Regions:
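Short aromatic-glycine-(Arg/Gly/Cys) micro-motifs in beta-strand/loop hairpins
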Residues: 1-14
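Residue-level detector of functional hotspots within protein domains
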Residues: 3-5, 19, 44-50
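Short, mixed-charge low-complexity intrinsically disordered segments
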Residues: 38-111
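A short, charged, amphipathic alpha-helix used as a generic interaction element across diverse proteins
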Residues: 21-37
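A short, exposed loop/beta-hairpin motif centered on an aromatic-Gly-Thr core
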Residues: 12-24
């Protein structure tokens, strides 16, 4: 039975997949985000009261959830990416030198 769920959200479209192991789910997360991220660069968006700069916009979000593991990666409108753990209370994962957001998430989730 598939224990880990991968959810990718992009401009109102949600795609879900299930995987048997955490390493499989994280590899699929990296593949999906690498495939979709190049087309997600954005310019400033006009809000009700202010302009929202690309670095403040989450253009693409990928999340992994399963037994003892919950986290994901936000791809910002400027192309940068941040890893986080948790769901309701997201905690950013600090990157070590030379580490990608995907590597940081793997380290944080113990995969």
């Amino acid at each position: 039975m598939a224990a880990y769920k991968l959810t990718v959200r992009r401009r109102g479209v949600t795609r879900r997949e299930r995987f048997a192991s955490l390493p499989e789910a994280l590899a699929a997360l990296e593949a999906r985000l690498d495939e979709l991220a190049p087309g997600e660069r954005r310019g400033p968006e006009r809000g009700l009261v202010r302009d929202i700069e690309p670095v403040a916009q989450v253009a693409l979000r990928g999340e992994v959830a399963g037994p003892g593991a919950r986290g994901g990666i936000d791809v910002r409108g400027d192309g940068s990416a941040e890893a986080y753990t948790g769901r309701l209370r997201r905690v950013l994962v600090a990157r070590e030198p030379g580490e990608t957001a995907h590597d940081a998430l793997r380290r944080a989730l113990g995969a």
